[in-house]
Every structure is written in structure tokens, then in C-alpha cells.
């Protein structure tokens, strides 16, 4: 970390313009994500996290991970914190182990579903939940660099990779004795965090596993595979005659599935199926689920027809978590596959979700059977419009031409459709989503609004 040597005491170490997005701090390695920034994040996290218990530190398989972990460890120990490094693990392992071992908090080095050139830092508090906005702002204030860390104390470090077994034991115990004997299941491990435990755990529970992208590879993580690229999973399920398949993202905090017919089982369907099982067991208070504004109208109408309540939040699992805590809900999540079960920690967990979905099935029953009994999604399409100018992207609602066109689209579709436009919290993208009762309307309005946004915002 020679780049730190030229920084005199009292001057910033870098990161003055960095702030928390929807999922921690994330960006391109070497520009946004640097060792200097990671050292600062580690130091100020060490100052903000309460108590004097250890801080856990994990990473996904990205090539830049060890470099950033080393810098975070240096910053944390400089703040006087004891650090336990977990090595390669899923993000939810950090959250669950923080809670199990009563740690002060945890940091995960990962950029989730982003490309290999990116990396990021996710932070968790003592309960394993993501940091509060007040805690994030306290760290951001430190990153503005008005005072350089004194770096006068040094906490101890321990390598505790064996703790991953404690995490997998929690997952196995969540099934309460249910097994997966005889189930042929494809797992797309995405060259990422899921390679650390998912395949071995499914096999231990009796499943016949076909594993794709099953070794950690920092240069290939998320490339043409995983939860954002389902075709390899779908093809393998069909070729091997599997009952189902699961695709994880880079840090395994979310999962999408396909059934034996190759049909997508997204987060909405997972919530419906898992929620229905809980409701039938009288284990879903007020039959309430929490989802986001991205969830499908077909899901909402089917769940309401079943007698349930669906509460919607802004996009981001932290918003789902907050609403669940406020409402006393036990299950929530996102269409993208972040599913949170309050009975099993308050962090999205792709491996846990996959296990629970597979274990719902009765002998002789397939996932396709359950999907057939769920709901038909409204046609929905999402287009990403690249808008490099951050102010234009974040302030798209000030563009009268675009807001007028959105209002016209919503009026034309009436109660049978909707438009959702939002700026990504992690990428320079404006996301335009249209949902309607007919594919023709969806395609027309998605293309029209996306092209208009490109014309008006990129001038």
C-alpha cells in the first residue's frame, strides 16, 4: 500500500466523495475501490461499531479481494479492533456468524452481481443486520477525510475459516430434519462465494448435484453465469433431466431457480411458494409478505386472492428488512432473488432460500407442480438506459418530457399496467420497467420510454 506513504498526518487518505449506495460501497477497482479507501473504511468502521467484540471479515472470489481484505484488516486493527478473517464465504455467512458469535459487526468484500473488475464493501452491525443510516453517515463523515486516522493502536487478528462450518450447520438445521434424498438438482455456483459450501451441503442432504462453475475464479465471477445469466442453468436442467436448478450471484446472498421444464422461478414465485407453506402451517402472521415495487402485479393479485397481505417497499433488501422489522413480518424479499426469513436471520441468503424451496416438496411432488399451482406473472420488461451523468440520472424526475410520457403510458394501460423508473444505486443506469396485461403493450412502452430517456438525459 505504498500509495499511503505520501499522505501526511492531518490530510485525507482518499474516499472523500464516497458514500453508501443501496448495498454498501461499490465501484471499479483502482478508481473507486482502492487500498487507501479500504483502509479508511476499516478504520472508521472500527470507530463506529459498538463494543469491543471481534469484527468478522469475509470476501467473495474476486481477484482484488485479498488486497482489499488486507487493507480493511489494517484499518480495523489500527482502530484497536480484533479481527477474525473468514476467507471465501457467502455474504450471509458473515451476517449469521456475527449474530451467532456476538461479534461487534462484520464486513464483506464483494460487488455481488457486478463484473469481476468491480468490488465493494458491505457492512453489518452486531445483530447481523446492515448498518443503520446514522452509522453509515458516521463512517461517511470519517471518509471525508477531515482528520487522518492516528493509527496508534493495533488490535489482534485471527484466521477463522473453520467458522464456515458453523454457518452450514445453521443452514442444515433450518430444514428441521427434512432431506433432499433422490432429488436431482443443478447448482450454478457462479465461480463465486457459493463454491465455498453449497455443493457439499446439498450433497450431504442427499441430493444428486450437477454443479456448474463450481470453483472460485476471480476473473470469471458472474461472467455469463449465475443469477443474472440463467441460460447455462436452464440448459443443464433440461440436459440432465433435473427436477430443478438454482443460480446464485457472486456473493450468494440471492438466488433464482428454474423448474424441471426450464421455467424461471423468480423471487416473487419463491415468496409465494414459501409464504404459502408458512401460511398453511399457521406460521405467517397476518399472512403478510414484504416485497418491493418491482414485484409483479400477478404475484400481488394472486397473494391477495389467497387472503394474504403484500406490503411494498423501495428497491433494496435494507428497505425490505426495515419494513419486516416494523410490521413484524417473517418473510420478505425482492423479485431479483434476495429473500429474507426472519426465522433464519435478517439477511438475504441464497443458499438457505434454495434449500428451503427444495425441501418444501413432498415425496413424488416436483417444483413444476408447485409452480403450476402458484400464479401467472403479468408480462414485464426491464430496460437499462446508461446515463453517465449522475445528476441527470438521479434527477430524472425533473425532466418534464419524460414524466409526461410516463403519465401518458400509465393512462393508456389503466389498472392493467404500470411503469416504474428508477436510478440504479450501484451502476450508472436508469432502469425502466413496464408491466401490463399484454406483451404488446409492454414492448411498446418499454422501448418508447427507454429511447426517450436516452434522448433527453444524455444531451
UniProtKB/Swiss-Prot annotation:
One of its GO terms (cellular component) is cytosol. Mg(2+) binds at residues 112, 249, 251, 253. Its cofactor is Mg(2+). Activated by phosphorylation. Binds 1 Mg(2+) ion per subunit. Keywords: Isomerase, Magnesium, Metal-binding, Phosphoprotein. It catalyses: alpha-D-glucosamine 1-phosphate = D-glucosamine 6-phosphate. HAMAP family: GlmM_B. This is Phosphoglucosamine mutase. The gene is glmM.
